[in-house]
Amino acid sequence: MNRPASRAVAIGVAAAMACATLVAVPHMAQAQPEAQTNAKKDVQVIAFQQTWNTVAKECTSTYGPEGVAYVEVSPPQESIQGTQWWTSYQPVSYKLDSKLGTEAEFKNMIKQCNAVGVDIIADVVLNQTTGADVADGKQTGVAGTEYNGSTGDYPGFATEQYPEGITASDFHSCSKNISNYANQQEVQECRLSSMWDFDSESEKVQDIQSDYLAALWNAGVRGFRMDAVKHIHTDSMKAIKEKFAKKIGVNADSIYWIQEVIGNSSEAAGIQP
């Protein structure tokens, strides 16, 4: 899959900033030893493509002692097979078993990080499922869930309310790749790099996705970085967030919520940050 170059650059910059922040903290602590109270700050580390066990160890050895407030981890849901970073952005179910670790390891990471005052932010993929990177016909995800990227059948997204999971009717009807970013409808209803585009206006899709967010919250996640939000209708994203907030019994505005929108003045006004 050819992900936009701007995303790769943004990730690299964010990672560099995170590393730079960590380098600076010990120096400050040495200069002001009386301030070593490890009070919760707003420092955030992006642990891009790090395993859950690695993050857990870093929380204990570095992030907690240095006063880091949040660690953002890569998408925790099951995805297509492969070691490339972008495979994490092609979900085949919302099971918390991924190439970065099992559900048990994910929950243990959160527990270990919380114990030293660090909260977890999850990178969340709601815009799409799989694209042309997977072979035709039936395939299996990293946790063994079957899906068919040719026909748009993803039974792994099943919930108690929707036991059939996701089918082709749960995606937008536009099957072409996005090419005209000045056309808001095309950007939000056609396919990003060939990936099936969720019909985010659908009550069913909103219910399944808000259930996933609630599952993350119940596992201990306390922040959400929403991927590719410029490709989701604003009203749909708001509805999903409100459904999620209702399910966990909190005010939607109180949730730590980050939306990825890469601005470009040449693109449609409705998809700008």
Per-segment meaning from a language model:
Residues 34-45, 52, 57-64, 68-69, ...:
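Active-site-proximal helices and loops of the catalytic beta/alpha 8
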Residues 47, 96-98, 228:
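Short glycine-centered, acidic/aromatic-flanked micro-motifs in structured strand/loop junctions
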Residues 1-31:
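Secretory targeting and sorting signals
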Residues 43-54, 195-206:
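Active-site mouth loops of central-metabolism enzymes
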Residues 39-42, 79-111, 146-149, 153-199:
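Aromatic- and acidic-residue-enriched carbohydrate-binding clefts of CAZyme catalytic domains
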Residues 7, 99-104, 112, 204-208:
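Short, motif-level signal for alpha-helix interfacial/capping segments enriched in acidic residues
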